[in-house]
């Protein structure tokens, strides 16, 4: 892999999760454009800089030795990538203060560098939270590859930060540069809520939760077929989102012990709040993690999963395959993984390579529900 070279540093960077023969870089031309722009503006060791949505730590690792740096994002994998890339390049892990996107990064900040996320609701919430955190004369610069940079991103900068102009494209990347101006304190439209009829739940969704406006169709297909009356099993909702699968399963299985895990901090925050609303003080574990990587081997009896098929802008089944491997390792002998997936993804064949037996629980023209026994 090529080194990431800018006026600030020359770095050897990796993506997370790692895979053999990784074809993709841990940085892009938008990262380079942002850092070149900041270098031209000039920074000192006293400059207070906030980086948002730094996918694999390219921005933070470049700036860490030079400024007072805070990084914030909603991906725990992004946090792990930042730590690994700092260590990989001999940089102090304490040189970057990391704040999960479920919390507000406290300023004041002189410069804010933003990688525009796929979910514009996350960008909107992040810009809203910048109110009162910007130093006088601060500049907020958002960047992305032109093909992934919607016009609405510039509109959000204008609304919440101040006058904005778009740069020329360089290497198919573009900057959106906003100068901080007086704006009235905004009211956030997040979290959103929607009502589920069966089971009867009102589900809260923070800004970066998948399908925050309504139940996704895969989960809708899965819910009627969740196993019930299984006793005191140890179960996990893997990639829990707002927690709906885990909560619905818990309602059907009053003695079950639940763990809800997602790599999104906002998802875990949503799941925790939804659990309390539905189940009160019933114990459960909530964890932002790299799937079940932190789960002890053989410590679960059941894993429920509606696996994702994309990481940021990259589509594929790598993450799903990794979740299946993690579930197999975390399950005790005789334990089961239950999943829902699009028919065309061929999960049945993939699960057969990992598990003792695979059965189809239910299906419709678009989705299939499978259970795989260890």
Swiss-Prot record:
Gene3D superfamilies associated with the record: Vaccinia Virus protein VP39 (3.40.50.150)
Pfam families: MTS
TM annotation in the entry: none
Keywords tagged on the record: Cytoplasm, Methyltransferase, rRNA processing, S-adenosyl-L-methionine, Transferase
EC number: 2.1.1.174
Subcellular location: Cytoplasm
Matching SUPFAM superfamilies: S-adenosyl-L-methionine-dependent methyltransferases
Top-level EC class as recorded in UniProt: transferase
Annotated protein name in UniProt: Ribosomal RNA large subunit methyltransferase G
Lineage of source species: Bacteria, Pseudomonadati, Pseudomonadota, Gammaproteobacteria, Pseudomonadales
Gene: rlmG
